[in-house]
Amino acid sequence: MLGPYLKSDAAWICPSVNADWPGSHAGLPEPTYGLNFTLSGYLLHPAPTTAQVEASSETILAAESEQPNMNVGLFASPFIFPPSVHQPAVCGRHFGQANVLWLDGHINARRPATAFWSKGFMDVATQERLHLGDILKGPYTGNAQTDDYYYELVKPAGG
């Protein structure tokens, strides 16, 4: 979606990340922004168009990301996943907040909600320390239709 408009892959690396960050892998340049998996084309072929999105100002395009991994702690994640996948990947690198790019083009900082699960990849205390979680419209409910609101193309009635 954005590739043809970028001059280099450096646009996918947060300038604030350094070798001290747990997910930096000894300072190797890896993507630090993840694309909303729902928009990636892996689920829908071809990838959805912006015309298919009901509320572009309430749909995440990309956000700062890392993924938990039992062996290395964190690793670069090219995607952020809806909360119902139980794989929190939004990373609050900036005073606990993550930069979020919305489909309509606006950007803001959001504090990821710490997941109370992570498929066993990382305990909640470590997630909180690393500011790793999901972007939610409200508190976790356990209901995918509610929790996945910002990640979905079609919004539930009563949004």
Regions found by a protein language model. Name each.
Residues 1-159:
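Short, well-structured segments within or immediately adjacent to enzyme catalytic domains
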